[in-house]
């Protein structure tokens, strides 16, 4: 069995007006089925602003990359910014 890579991205909406649940669904739909979204957390930042934290797994392979994940995130309407918080190789 090959190793996998775990990524955690924090995604911020463009504005307070962005529906956080719709943004969450849009990001999941954009990443799937190629990238596995294990979990999504909603983080209250303040002043009505919320961030999303996506826990993503992908095979350790040249066909998958964090650069591609970031391209996909940039292409989602409503995404104002993102940050890679965690990157680790998983092996079982």
Curated annotation (Swiss-Prot):
- One Pfam family matching this protein: EF1_GNE
Q: Which Gene3D superfamilies match?
A: 3.30.70.60
Q: Name one GO molecular function term.
A: translation elongation factor activity
Keyword Transport on this protein? Answer: no
Output the NCBIfam families linked to this UniProt entry: PRK00435.1
Q: What does this protein do?
A: Promotes the exchange of GDP for GTP in EF-1-alpha/GDP, thus allowing the regeneration of EF-1-alpha/GTP that could then be used to form the ternary complex EF-1-alpha/GTP/AAtRNA.
Looking up HAMAP family in the UniProt record yields: EF1_beta (MF_00043)
Protein name (database record) = Elongation factor 1-beta
| Lineage start | Archaea, Thermoproteota, Thermoprotei, Thermoproteales, Thermoproteaceae
């Amino acid at each position: 069995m090959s190793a996998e890579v775990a990524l955690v991205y924090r995604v911020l909406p463009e504005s307070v007006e962005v529906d956080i649940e719709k943004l969450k669904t849009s990001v999941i739909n954009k990443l799937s089925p190629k990238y596995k979204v294990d979990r999504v957390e909603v983080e209250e930042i303040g002043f009505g602003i919320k961030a999303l934290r996506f826990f993503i797994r992908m095979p350790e392979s040249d066909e998958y990359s964090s650069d591609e994940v970031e391209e996909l995130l940039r292409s989602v309407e409503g995404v104002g910014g993102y940050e890679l918080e965690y990157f680790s190789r998983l092996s079982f």
